[in-house]
């Protein structure tokens, strides 16, 4: 029997444009449970069985204590669904112990570069990988002129850097970068609701010719 831990750090979620954009509470965990069932089905033939134990850490909670709890109960493999800074702290807290962490959520590029850790493996693609994949597809489709709507949050700017890098690598052309200063919900006027779709013609007015609008 191989016990596998799943440590999920809850983070404060922004307001969503639509209820359809709200993440399900078991996001990530549900995927691990499906994988567990699949592996245990074939595991009957290879005499391998896996169990999954989930530790959810509330916003501002002690993720290191939850990881230590899993380690003390014999979990040598722990899936970590947490922001990059939390992942690095967890890696340092468990250094030298027989525990291997799997990054299943953080997309930060530095985790595979200057902040690479020997006790962390990655299943989540980083932003550069995601941008490279998008760029290769767009160039293959001959959609090489890109209009970029950029946000103002650190995550937005990090993805924007990845898009710029991918454009240079694969031959895309960013015809314009335009900052989108919007709220995170549909209320944009004092008089009531205004659909985001209706804002796009105004937002893109006067832009150079482009094949694709990329949201960063």
Q: Language-model segments: which ranges?
A:
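Signal peptide-proximal N-terminal region
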Residues: 15, 22-54, 171
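Short, well-structured alpha-helical segments in soluble
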Residues: 57-76, 137, 190-209
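Short beta-strand segments enriched in small/hydrophobic residues
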Residues: 1-28, 36-38, 146-149
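A generic secondary-structure signal
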Residues: 38-42, 69, 136-140, 165-166, ...
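Structural motif
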Residues: 79, 212-216
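Short beta-strand elements in bilobed, periplasmic/extracellular small-molecule ligand-binding domains
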Residues: 41-59, 116-120, 167-193, 212
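Extracytoplasmic ligand/sensor domains, especially the bilobed periplasmic-binding protein
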Residues: 75-179, 183-184
